[in-house]
Regions:
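Radical SAM/AdoMet-radical enzyme domain recognition
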Residues: 1-100
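A C-terminal junction/extension of Radical SAM enzymes
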Residues: 101-138
């Protein structure tokens, strides 16, 4: 039995990784929404650096982990670019969950919603990635 947990990764440290190794049946999906500038604009200053450090620790401890990516009208091409995917693979990411942005609440940013054309692009691009990226399950 395997358990998956979604996290921003900011509290992952050596002790946490050792606990994950001891348990042996948990995999984390770390939230990332692009490279540093875009990620930190949505998740807070310094989050990108913290999640990259968390990925390094998880990889060093031989733990299987992935990423959770919320794509928007602003980042959809970046988070499906070869450069971004190569970075994730180099960091040790083994799978990626892609979620389209859904505005929630009274002050949600509706400008981040994808257009029908952008959604179609994502539909085809994710299938293309699935066919070529042998080291990453999407």
């Amino acid at each position: 039995c395997m358990f998956y947990a979604f996290t921003n990764g900011t509290l992952i440290d050596e002790e946490f990784c050792k606990d994950m190794q001891r348990l042996g049946n948990i995999s984390l999906a770390l939230s990332v929404e692009g490279f540093e500038e875009v990620n930190d604009s949505r998740r807070g200053s310094g989050c990108f650096e913290k999640v990259m450090h968390a990925m390094d620790l998880l990889k060093e401890h031989g733990l299987i982990f992935g990423t959770s990516i919320c794509y928007t009208s602003k980042n959809y091409k970046t988070v499906t670019s070869d450069e971004f995917l190569d970075m994730l693979i180099d960091k040790g990411v083994r799978y990626a969950w892609y979620f389209h942005y859904m505005p929630v609440g009274n002050e949600a940013a509706t400008d981040l919603l994808l257009t029908p054309e952008q959604r179609e692009y994502m539909y085809h691009r994710i299938r293309e990635i699935r066919g070529f990226e042998a080291n990453l399950c999407i």
